[in-house]
Amino acid sequence: MNNLFLRHGEVYNPKNIHYSNLPGFSLSTTGNFQAKSIGQKIKKNFEIEKIITSPLLRARQTAQLVNEFLNVKIEISNDIIEWQGPEGWTGKIFNEITNTQAYSKYKSNPLTIDTVKEPLEKVYERVNKLVNENQHCLMVSHQDTIRAYFYFELKEARFNLNKPNHCDVQYIKNGKLKVLSLT
């Protein structure tokens, strides 16, 4: 076992905002439950020496709740922060972005979006750097950040396959993507 990736728990977002890197988006009650539940599963199935988390609140909260079961050091790294997505999405409600051309590209193949501040290849590079510097870590991050890493690392055919759900653990074993989920 090398490193595991954990997507943060469900976020409290009653206005359905594309929050991206906006501060202050915390876990919902369900998200808190998800984090504690997956923490128990991680403890039973893996040897973790440290947790590295995105600096965003929802990821830090997930890391802290999981760590109630692991009791290891927690570090914060910008290398696994949320991908911001297409320009102009952050802070808008989802209904405002779902009819855009960028959203259509995001749903079919986000690699074709040309209005991003950071290409997904660059996301992979920053995450891969962190992965190569660590072993036996749980990295608490975000859906598209995690997906970018595994898509490029495993040279997969389609980006939108295998996106992690809230509190899914993903890792590579024998060259294949493996998932530990709450269900």
What are these model-predicted stretches?
Residues 3, 134-144:
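Generic beta-sheet signal
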Residues 26, 68-126:
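Phosphate-handling substructures
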Residues 6, 77-79, 180-182:
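Conserved beta-strand termini and adjacent loop/short-helix elements that scaffold enzyme active sites
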Residues 7-74:
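Active-site-proximal alpha-helix that buttresses catalytic centers in soluble enzyme cores
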Residues 15-18, 63, 86-90, 152:
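Short aromatic-enriched loop/helix-cap "lid" or pocket-rim segments at secondary-structure transitions
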Residues 58-60, 83, 145-147:
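Short, active-site-adjacent cap segments at secondary-structure transitions
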Residues 32-39, 120, 124-131:
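Short, amphipathic alpha-helical "lid/cap" segments that border enzyme active or binding sites
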Residues 156-183:
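Domain-level recognition of soluble alpha/beta enzyme cores
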